[in-house]
UniProtKB/Swiss-Prot annotation:
It is found in: Cytoplasm. Residues 60-64 are annotated as: G2. Residues 10-206 form the tr-type G domain. Pfam families: GTP_EFTU, GTP_EFTU_D2, GTP_EFTU_D3. Keywords: Cytoplasm, Elongation factor, GTP-binding, Hydrolase, Magnesium, Metal-binding, Nucleotide-binding, Protein biosynthesis. Its EC number is 3.6.5.3. Monomer. This is Elongation factor Tu 2. One of its GO terms (molecular function) is guanosine tetraphosphate binding. It comes from Caulobacter sp. (strain K31). Its main location: cytoplasm. Belongs to the TRAFAC class translation factor GTPase superfamily. Classic translation factor GTPase family. EF-Tu/EF-1A subfamily. GTP hydrolase that promotes the GTP-dependent binding of aminoacyl-tRNA to the A-site of ribosomes during protein biosynthesis.
Length: 396
């Protein structure tokens, strides 16, 4: 039978496997592709294919990530799997591979381990909307009571990080048995059950075009007789000619009206997410707008200076700092299109942050930036990236 073409008409969702080292994340990823390939929903990949994850760069940081894609009856998925713990930390903090949901893999033989906890915390900090659990390696556990105990531990751990531990679906099985074609109850059927759960439990993300309009300002020009044009790539939503927009960040919020949208020197009646456009603003002077601000739907985003960040600090080998930093460290924070100086305060009981650490930091910027939870940024010193972070919580 000829293999069916990957249809792009199904809703798309980005997911990934997370969990402790050697609990079976990559084996599960391979098992999903192998089982779904039987119904034409994937190209089968073995463990070695996925484990040889290529290097990629995100915000100046090198990360190893494997990408596979597959589809169920309802959705098309892009799935990320990382070979090492440090890659997970970097991936989740930089948002290199966006996750709309994640499969937490826990070995039934070991139960939750330190990285299980750390990945759940990271998922919470970076705003992964939903998790499901695959309890792997049940073929190694004979005692039903032990499985119940592990399930209870996992649920308590999830609840302690504000995930709905009592409600999160847990699928029990063995990814290795599924790959080897062993007992279908814990093998193939568990993989199909997991995918049904992922389909049902991980909410369909909003498409960028359906979100409120936002465009980071990259450049500002003044066109005689027409007014001021700001250029940039629309990040989300749609802007239509005649609509009110706000200019947010760096200075006081200003309201103005979009009187024209142009792309490739052609006039359009609207611009949408993904478009590189020039937006003509009525009555706005060239000196009223600057790179680093955003154009947005009025009231949809506000400027802030104080926030809690989850950040990863590069190692010396990654081109980062050679020495630790202490409280009151003042680097630049690169948000969208511009650098803003900020002051970092370390948490109580934390003496210093070493290169290679990931940590929660309290940050205060010297000028306000349009931000919401989940916004990514780079930490820089004199134009060189020394870290990456995400806004975990806005303070003021």
């Amino acid at each position: 039978m000829a293999k069916e073409k990957f249809e792009r008409n199904k809703p798309h969702c980005n997911i990934g496997t997370i969990g402790h080292v050697d609990h079976g994340k990559t084996t599960l990823t391979a098992a999903i592709t192998i089982i779904l390939a039987k119904s034409g929903g994937a190209t089968a990949k073995n463990y070695a294919d996925i484990d040889a994850a290529p290097e990629e760069k995100a915000r100046g940081i090198t990360i190893n990530t494997a990408h596979v894609e597959y589809e169920t009856a309802n959705r098309h998925y892009a799935h990320v799997d990382c070979p090492g713990h440090a890659d997970y930390v970097k991936n989740m903090i930089t948002g290199a591979a966006q996750m709309d949901g994640a499969i937490l893999v826990v070995s039934a033989a070991d139960g939750p381990m330190p990285q299980t906890r750390e990945h759940i915390l990271l998922a919470r900090q970076v705003g992964v909307p939903a998790l499901v659990v695959y309890m792997n390696k049940v073929d190694l556990v004979d005692d039903e009571e032990l499985l119940e105990l592990v399930e209870m531990e996992v649920r308590e751990l999830l609840s302690s990080y504000d995930f709905p531990g009592d409600d999160i679906p847990i699928t029990k099985g063995s990814a290795k048995v599924a790959i080897d074609g062993g007992d279908p109850v814990i093998g193939e059927q568990s993989i199909l059950a997991l995918m049904t759960t992922v389909d049902a439990y991980i909410p369909q993300p909003d498409r960028p075009i359906d979100l409120p309009f936002l465009m980071p300002v990259e450049d500002v020009f003044s066109i005689s007789g027409r007014g001021t044009v700001v250029t940039g790539r629309i990040e989300k939503g749609v802007v239509k000619v005649g609509e009110e927009v706000e200019i947010v960040g760096i200075r006081a919020v200003q309201k103005t009206t979009c009187t024209g949208v142009e792309m490739f020197r052609k006039l359009l009646d609207q611009g949408q997410a993904g478009d590189n456009v020039g937006v003509l603003l009525r009555g706005t002077k060239r000196e009223d707008v600057e790179r680093g601000q955003v154009l947005c739907k009025p009231g949809s985003i506000t400027p802030h200076t104080k926030f809690v960040a989850e950040a990863y600090i590069l190692t010396k080998e990654e081109g980062g700092r050679h020495t630790p930093f202490f409280t009151n460290y003042r680097p630049q924070f690169y948000f969208r299109t511009t650098d803003v100086t900020g002051i970092i305060k370390l948490r109580e009981g934390v003496e210093m942050i070493m290169p290679g650490d990931n940590a929660e930091l309290d940050v205060e910027l010297i000028t306000p930036i349009a931000m919401d939870q989940g916004l990514r940024f780079a930490i820089r010193e004199g134009g060189r990236t020394v870290g990456a972070g995400v806004v975990a919580k806005i303070v003021e």
